[in-house]
Structures are given as C-alpha cells and as structure tokens.
Regions:
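Outer-membrane beta-barrel translocator domains and adjoining extracellular loop/strand segments
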Residues: 84-91, 127-139, 169-174, 224-229, ...
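Outer-membrane beta-barrel "beta-signal"
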Residues: 235-245, 412, 419, 440-453
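Gram-negative outer-membrane beta-barrel domains
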Residues: 110-113, 232, 314-321, 407, ...
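Detector for outer-membrane/organellar transmembrane beta-barrel domains
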Residues: 229, 239-243, 247-393
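Bacterial Sec-dependent N-terminal signal peptides
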Residues: 1-29
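Outer membrane beta-barrel
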Residues: 59-84, 90-222, 226-244, 364, ...
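Conserved C-terminal beta-signal and adjacent last beta-strands/turns
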Residues: 367-383, 404-414, 419-423
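N-terminal periplasmic/intermembrane-space "pro-region" immediately following the signal or transit peptide
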Residues: 23-77, 209, 240, 244, ...
C-alpha cells in the first residue's frame, strides 16, 4: 500500500474513532418541529424571526409570518479521494473536491397546505454518459410547488427528484449512508425531472399503510427547463408499509439514527415509460434526436421496472433494489439530427437492424441489483457494507466500465446527518473485456465531511 493510501486511511480511521457525539434527519415528508420561536412585533403586522430556541444543525434559518414561514438551509460536503487501478496498488491518484455545495430554500403557506421548494448546487460536477450536450442546467436542482389539501393527498408541480427512480434517489445526497450512490443508481436513475406528480398516504387498517405515487414528466431531466425534445415520461410507484410508518422520517435516510423499537419495513415496486427518449437514461435530454426520411422527429421508447425495500430495527438497517430496462425503436428511422440542428441521413448500405442497434447502443439497457446493510452503535458511530452488480444488454454501448462493486463505510454522526464524517473503502471490478494483466478494477479510499446549517 502506498504512502498516500496509508495516510488517508489512517486519517479516516482516527477521525471516526476520536470525535464526540451528538442528532436530526431529513425527510421529504412535511412535519412540524416542536421548538419555540422568538418573535418581535412590527407595526402590528408580521413577526420576524431569529434562530429558534433549541436550534440544531440542519434546521436552517427560518423567517416566520402569521401565514407561513420561509427557511434557508445551506449544506457543504468536501471529499478527499485516493485510488489506484493497478493490482499492486501502485501509481495511485488523488482527488480533492467539493462534492456538494447546496442552498435549500423552503416555504410553507396557508397552514402548511402550500409549500415552495428550491435548491441550488454550486458544485455541480455532472458529466453526460454520452458526449455532447444541447442544453443542461447544472446549478438548479429543484424548483417546485406542492399542494396538500389534506393529510392523504399531495400534488407537486415543477422540478424535483422523481418518485419513480430507485429508493436510493428518495434519499438526499447529504443523508445517504455511503459517500456515493450505488453502481445501480448511477446506471439507471435520472433523479431530477420536470412535471406533475401525486403521492398518497392510505391506512388500510391497523398498522398497514399504502403509498401510491404517480408521475407525469418531460423525461428530459433538467434539460427540460430549456426545451422538451422528446415525448413524455409516465410513471407509477406503489409502496407498502406493513408495520406502520418509520420514526421521524426514517423512510428517507439510511442508517437507523433513531433505533426503531419495533421492526419497520417498506417494500415498493416502480414502473416508468418514456414514449420519446432522447438521452441514455433521461438525464441529458435532447442528446440524441432521430428522424424519418422527411426529417420528422422519431424517437425510441424506454421503459424501466424496479423493485426495492428498506428495513430498520434497533440500529440495524438493510436496503436493496433491482432494476430492468428495455427499449423499442421505430422501424422507419432514416437519420439523426446533429447538435447544430442539421440532419444527417443514414446511408443506403445501413440495414434496418444496424440502425436499430445504433439507436439502442445509446441507451442504458440491461439490469442490475444492489443490496446493503449497516448498524448504528449507541455512540452514533455506524458501519455499513454494499454490493452492486450490473448486467448490460449486449447491444447497448458500455455505460459503465464496471460490472461489480464492493463498498465498506464507517460514519461518525456528530449531529445526525447535519454534521458527520464518513470514511469509505471500495473496489469496483472492471468488466472482463477491459481487464488486463495489471488491471482488474479500481481500488479506492475516500473521506468526506458533511455540514448542514
């Protein structure tokens, strides 16, 4: 092991063992915190707020009026990575980056019936799965309005992380139990999209809960803020909770911070259909546009099926998911549009099968599986392990150099997800076709600090 690798490994282990402890977790469910606010009257009108009593990291700064509130919450994640692609760990490389630098804006109005949410990421490091880009917004991640007529029904309008990706994407980047999302999520989850959504919360009797989610979006991701190039994406998710809801939003973060006294489980299935896919997985909309002989736009359809679960009990948690994607190509595609908008017709020598394979090769097609588990010790120190595998369709171009990934993480929670240190060791295995006598994968260690104000 090299000096660089030894150093970052030693730093990570020391920090995780030596820090003191303190707790708050994120949730996409709206709830009222039981803290007290201090007001100052102004002309008999509105009250202004300062930091509330009992303030915890992650609460943000909130301004209160008689009809609602307005919250600002910045967050920062710094990442230090050392990795090597050689079997003997020689010639390592190091990367120090700002992983996330976000500003969250949230407002509640009219007794929590209406909420507004926006999020900016000033450290966006998005890289398209395929080269080229027509339009892409790297800073604005969320901007939406939510209407809650009652506790059962919620309607959402705008840009946000979608309900119809894997369960990992329901968890904020600051609240996942690992430093990075899994190989499965990277391959198949578009995450952000612009559209109209519905979510429900139905009690079936006793402790049984059913949560349906419906989604109607552009299918172009954040590119849709400039133009919707393709058709639309339709999706549905159905979650079942047999043992009632999780404590304090525990459905929307990984480690069992509040040590569930009784077993909690959510099992879900999800399906989405994009009737006009223009990018590899719905992230970089408008990347690939095809047309018929008259230059009318023709696009492939892209469908995705998934199943997942999350279980928690007494400090333990386990989460897993499976994804399968397929596509269908129109038979009369005659060419494609270049990034400058001009049309490039395919040659007469290209067969229908070759054209079909060309279109399919630009989509993330295949299947994958991810499973992970972890335990939180009473001293707010957690350990976890994860295994992910991908099986690409034979026709699709390689959207990942790796087909298996093994990850081990330890996390020291100083104030819940609002202040924590994570250290991770991992190995991603190269696909057989890419292995050499000296390289069979990527070995890495990384250290990340997270703070949310």
């Amino acid at each position: 092991m090299t000096k660089q690798t030894k150093l970052i490994t030693l730093i990570g282990i020391c920090l995780c063992f030596c820090m003191a402890q303190f707790a708050f977790a994120q949730s996409d469910e709206l709830y009222t915190r039981d803290s007290t606010y201090t007001f100052s009257e102004t002309s008999g009108n509105v009250s202004l707020l300062r930091l509330k009593k009992g303030y915890l990291l992650g609460d943000g700064i909130t301004f209160i009026s008689g009809k609602g509130n307005f919250n600002l919450s910045p967050s920062l994640q710094t990442l230090y990575l050392v990795n090597s692609t050689n079997k003997n760990l020689s010639s390592p490389s190091s990367t120090f980056v700002i992983n996330r630098a976000r500003l969250n804006v949230f407002s509640n109005l009219f007794d929590n019936k209406v909420s507004l949410s926006a999020r900016l990421n000033f450290a966006a490091n998005y890289a398209s799965a395929t080269t080229g880009n027509r339009s892409f917004n790297t800073v604005l991640q969320e901007a939406n309005i939510e209407y809650r007529p009652n506790r059962t029904h919620v309607f959402n309008f705008g840009l946000r992380a979608d309900y119809i990706d894997g369960r990992e994407t329901r968890i904020e980047g600051e609240s996942i139990g690992f430093i990075d999302r899994s190989l499965l999520s990277d391959a198949f989850d578009a995450i952000f999209d612009f559209g109209i959504r519905y979510k429900g919360n139905y009690r079936l009797g006793g402790k049984h809960l059913l949560k349906p989610y419906l989604s109607f979006t552009t299918g172009d991701g954040r590119s849709a803020l400039q133009k919707n190039y393709g058709g639309f994406k339709y999706g549905v998710r159905l979650d079942y909770l047999p043992f009632d809801k999780f404590s304090r939003g525990g459905e929307f973060y990984m480690d069992d911070l509040y040590r569930e006294e009784k077993p909690k489980l959510v099992v879900g299935v999800v399906y989405s259909y994009n009737d006009g896919a223009t990018s590899a997985k719905g992230t970089n909309g408008g990347r690939w546009l095809y047309g018929d002989a008259n230059q009318n736009i023709l696009l492939p359809s892209y469908s995705k099926f998934g199943a997942d679960y999350l279980f928690k009990y007494n400090g333990w948690y386990s989460m897993g998911g499976f994804v399968l994607t397929k596509a269908k190509v129109p038979s009369n595609i005659a060419g494609e549009f270049r990034l400058d908008g001009s049309f490039s017709a395919y040659t007469a020598s290209q067969t229908a099968q070759q054209i079909k394979d060309r279109v399919l090769s630009r989509l993330n097609l295949g299947k994958g599986f991810n499973v992970q588990a972890g335990y939180l010790f009473p001293v707010d120190w957690a350990v976890g392990a994860r295994y992910s595998t991908l099986n690409e369709n034979n026709v699709t171009a390689s959207f990942s150099d790796y087909d298996k990934s093994y990850t081990f993480v330890t996390t020291k929670y100083l104030s819940g997800h609002a202040l924590k240190i994570q250290f991770e060791l991992g190995y991603s295995q190269l696909k057989e076709a890419l292995k050499t006598s000296t390289q069979n994968g990527n070995y890495y260690s990384q250290l990340q600090f997270t703070i949310q104000l």
